[in-house]
Amino acid sequence: LVIRRLTSSKTQLLGLRPSILHGLLILLLVISFSVLTFALALRWIISDNIPLSNGYESMLSVAWFSMLITIVMAFAMRSLRLLIITFGFLLSGFFLLVSHIGQMDPAIGHIMPVLNSPLLSIHVSIIMMSYALLALTFICGLTALILSALQRMRGCLQTGLEQSTALMTLSRIFLYPAMTTLGLGIFIGAIWANISWGNYWSWDPKETWALITFMVYAVLLHLQSVPALRTPKYYHIYTTIAFLTIVITYFGVNYVLGGMHSYA
């Protein structure tokens, strides 16, 4: 939908004016967000714990944060509304799909006593928000690369560059709060670990990969020191590849590497 809208000179799409299409998409997103909020609230009430105790609930939470960020950004940046809304649908839909794969257990159970801490709930919530924001930078990068390839095939190099630059700007808008929340989430997690386990950092696989993820994305905050990343093309390639660190941090650690965080 986004690619067709950005590469077509027509003002209408699917026979609808842009304003009507945007309104319908926002309405659908708000309805989806409300249903997911209701579902998470029910799990919270039934279990008497914030729904972040296992992989299934954390995926639902990432989808919830993706929808929330999308709704806020859609109203804040009207000129990019279609792009932002579509990204939100793609991300939240992907996370909801992943939550229903065979490895995820949707059963509501009792939380481990050591995990029943307000600090842990804050830590996981902030980390999930950062993952949602960084996933949006990944979608920006992937979309920019696809659009650039399409415009190159059509011989519209200048148009492709303009679109890539706009997506780079949007990606950096997501990047700064993502890095802030990721750093804050790791910091709060270290405090909770010291209270629960007696040490701030134990080089557990997830701790190590969370630090690697933070360092990989921190490179994007220093564009003045890395001239190549000032170019939209290389910036988007970097953000697309960098997302693999999040995939390893979440899925690789949980289902392959193990460790104390394998329950999360």
Model regions: which residues?
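Active-site/ligand-binding-proximal alpha/beta "capping" segment
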Residues: 111
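Membrane-interfacial, low-structure loops and terminal tails that flank and connect transmembrane helices
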Residues: 9-20, 151-170
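Hydrophobic alpha-helical bundle architecture
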Residues: 200-204
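Hydrophobic cores of alpha-helical transmembrane segments in multi-pass integral membrane proteins
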Residues: 1-8, 22-49, 53-108, 122-149, ...
